């Protein structure tokens, strides 16, 4: 039985109880949301040590951190450190997007290193195995694709991106609809190229029922990938993106009938004024499936600062219904991120998520209230306790010290200090 099947039968699972307690909501409310497919629970049946996480309606906006090797840089220990740092700074989930080295070993080591849910893109492994054999990616067979997917599910991944919306029909449209950036999804591109080469339908779409069987066996959440997401602002909201979205919406409904949990991935580059409409359209087209967005980035001309562009877009997306933010690092569009890039990316995404969560959950807002109270009292010890990034708090305080009880920005000119002293003097006089 999957979490969705249990929920439909009125069963509150251990995972639902655990999550409801952490989220501060009633177990039965969570059960109803899971039954409808409005909320998903990450917890592969064989991933025994994972702490389950819920994404979707009625729960907090979550943050994912992507890590993984590339064909140029293969350092397994660094990837494990990235995973640990990401979790330390609040990542709710990790995606291993490795494309270089022993992918099975890397994935399994990352899964053992942390206790948060793990996601992958299995088609990457199918493609990498072709290259390792000296073959072209388009030479992979349908069996190669299915073997990679089943291997990841058996290993215990809790969610997996599958580009089921890259169909033969939409690939044909690509021949007449010109984009500025083109197609930027790796997994989506692998499948589009395969379709063009063999003139056959995407196996993951053609045999979607088989994909559902595999996902159901392990209770893996299918993250329906946006292979045709816009890779730059000029391509946002074009016919290709929207055509894929409506295909994904139909596939969500089929998955729900089969008792399989799904979420839908969203755009990566969107002008700031279009974000509310795009997220709301996603919710309508998918019957309120959980929405997973990469950013979205609100500008393209700040390489090195894309984590900030992504946090701005992520906050707006979450405010308008996005449920799951995939972080963006300062290395986006430039190279493979290092550990520090991962830390900065997670913090930026957590900031965006918290900005929305504090509007919906009293305990989240309480943190900000307590910080305001501590600042109003110049209580630095309390501010440190509440601060999200305590290391940065200490670093700046030590770098620019002051002899006053204020900070080195104002010192004796501190507005809070002056008015407190004057009010106290007035009351005692």
Curated annotation (Swiss-Prot):
Pathway: Cofactor biosynthesis; thiamine diphosphate biosynthesis
UniProt: Zn(2+) binding residues: 269, 333
An individual GO BP term: thiamine diphosphate biosynthetic process
Enzyme class: lyase
Pfam families noted in UniProt: ThiC_Rad_SAM
Keyword check for Lyase: yes
Binding site for [4Fe-4S] cluster: 407, 410, 414
Protein's job: Catalyzes the synthesis of the hydroxymethylpyrimidine phosphate (HMP-P) moiety of thiamine from aminoimidazole ribotide (AIR) in a radical S-adenosyl-L-methionine (SAM)-dependent reaction.
Listed PANTHER family: PHOSPHOMETHYLPYRIMIDINE SYNTHASE, CHLOROPLASTIC (PTHR30557:SF1), THIAMINE BIOSYNTHESIS PROTEIN THIC (PTHR30557)
Name assigned to this protein: Phosphomethylpyrimidine synthase
Source organism of the structure: Pyrococcus abyssi (strain GE5 / Orsay)
